[in-house]
């Protein structure tokens, strides 16, 4: 299976009443992608509450950052698994 460079573009979200950039919800996604052999790069965007996975310049997966489970390794997070499938199917 081909391994990809995955750019995770994420925007700020409200946590404890404060709008800020946080990667805690992205850790499980990162761990799952790395364990499958992909390289992962984070990039901040202005799109609030949004996460996009970009492979070869194309958006292959999009979700709200709150759809991802906080912390963990991503193995029990169904959204992380859908994202991994989308990356695996990318050209």
From Swiss-Prot:
InterPro entries: UPF0728 (IPR027885). Belongs to the UPF0728 family. This is UPF0728 protein v1g117062.
């Amino acid at each position: 299976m081909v391994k990809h460079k995955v750019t995770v573009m994420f925007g700020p979200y409200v946590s404890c009443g404060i709008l800020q950039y946080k990667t805690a919800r992205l850790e499980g996604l990162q761990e799952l992608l790395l364990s499958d052999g992909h390289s992962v790069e984070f990039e901040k965007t202005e799109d609030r509450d949004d996460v996009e996975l970009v492979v070869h310049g194309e958006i292959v997966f999009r979700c709200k950052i709150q759809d991802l489970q906080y912390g963990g390794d991503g193995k029990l997070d169904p959204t992380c698994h859908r994202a991994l499938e989308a990356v695996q199917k990318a050209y």
